């Protein structure tokens, strides 16, 4: 009996690993169908008890594997831009720019996952799939991300994604009006405006 239980557990483990791998492969394949797009987004952040913490809107331009421009227009304006090497964060209100190396961006950051769509990043997660919904749980609990959920259609259109942090805070992003096609390269370049403070962490 014990031997049968051991074999059953082993089979279950192998099956579940295969299911995770298939789901991750399907997710990566869907995302690969669209290499560049522009979309509008709305953001809603809720606390552990479900209370609204913040809501916002903005625009997103993306070109895989490493180019993006995430521009928040409300409630406050800001921009997170990757030119392929440097990750720029610009906050006009405080007149400050932060520059870091994109390669140092962690793979447990949801947006970096979507942008890079790299197998080595997805391998760090157990991925479950139900139709167009994918649920990712980090294999390591060392990071701040507890769970990541994303809805992607079979043609590669991202409808929404949600990041849940270890403390229960949840950030949901809904994408609308996604337009697939060539994106102007100017969207992925950034030069700090004169007069702003530059916090250059690329040392």
Curated annotation (Swiss-Prot):
InterPro entries: LolA/LolB/LppX, OM_lipoprot_carrier_LolA-like, OM_lipoprot_carrier_LolA_Pbac. Belongs to the LolA family. Participates in the translocation of lipoproteins from the inner membrane to the outer membrane. Only forms a complex with a lipoprotein if the residue after the N-terminal Cys is not an aspartate (The Asp acts as a targeting signal to indicate that the lipoprotein should stay in the inner membrane). GO terms for biological process: lipoprotein localization to outer membrane; lipoprotein transport. Keywords: Chaperone, Periplasm, Protein transport, Signal, Transport. GO terms for cellular component: outer membrane-bounded periplasmic space. Monomer. Residues 1-21 form the signal peptide. It is found in: Periplasm. It comes from the Bacteria. This is Outer-membrane lipoprotein carrier protein.
